[in-house]
Amino acid sequence: MSALWLLLGLLALMDLSESSNWGCYGNIQSLDTPGASCGIGRRHGLNYCGVRASERLAEIDMPYLLKYQPMMQTIGQKYCMDPAVIAGVLSRKSPGDKILVNMGDRTSMVQDPGSQAPTSWISESQVSQTTEVLTTRIKEIQRRFPTWTPDQYLRGGLCAYSGGAGYVRSSQDLSCDFCNDVLARAKYLKRHGF
């Protein structure tokens, strides 16, 4: 019986190591990022900025994100996108003290009522659409800049997701606030199980 538990434990470790770095668009764990701008931090009542602010905002959103982690993993596999990046984008789209609520035909921001959190934060089709738009932007960057690295494609795709397809004109445009904040949140979420 103990050999069975040992085998199951080894399989779980192998699965963990395989899923800890996947996605077709760069390795977020190896990316350096300055995190959220001070404007983002101040906008959400924080008196600090950078990675610390991004991590705090992701931490606030984590209880809601965890409910949708299996959905993000499924969608991540479909689009070959790291679920931590998907979670980082969703966290950025629902900053700090606000949460996204599925209102049927639209998504609305509402104040977090604490223990009375909504049962439906965001739908699978909305998460899928968000991920599809991001991967489309990344592929546009790949076509426009074929010599860039996968990490540059991810950064470029995140900046283009936020600023539009024409936002990225050179490698100097890869440090937009949206990208820096999302990557810092994604790295934090990755360390916490995404």
From Swiss-Prot:
Gene3D superfamilies, from UniProt? Answer: 1.10.530.10
Q: Which domain of life is it from?
A: Eukaryota
Swiss-Prot/TrEMBL keywords = Disulfide bond, Glycosidase, Hydrolase, Secreted, Signal
Which EC class heads this enzyme's classification?
A: hydrolase
Q: What is its EC number?
A: 3.2.1.-
Task: Tell me which Gene Ontology terms the entry assigns under biological process.
Answer: defense response to Gram-positive bacterium; peptidoglycan catabolic process
> Which residues are the signal sequence here?
1-19
All disulfide bonds of the chain are 24-80, 38-49
**Localisation per UniProt entry:** Secreted
User: Where does this protein chiefly localize?
Assistant: secreted
Q: Does the keyword Transmembrane helix apply?
A: no
Any one cellular-component term (Gene Ontology): extracellular region
Q: Which GO terms describe its molecular function?
A: lysozyme activity
Check the record and name the CDD domains matching this protein. Answer: lyz_G-like_1
Q: Which family does it belong to?
A: Belongs to the glycosyl hydrolase 23 family.
Stored PANTHER family? LYSOZYME G FAMILY MEMBER (PTHR31698), LYSOZYME G-LIKE PROTEIN 1 (PTHR31698:SF5)
Report the protein name in the record: Lysozyme g-like protein 1
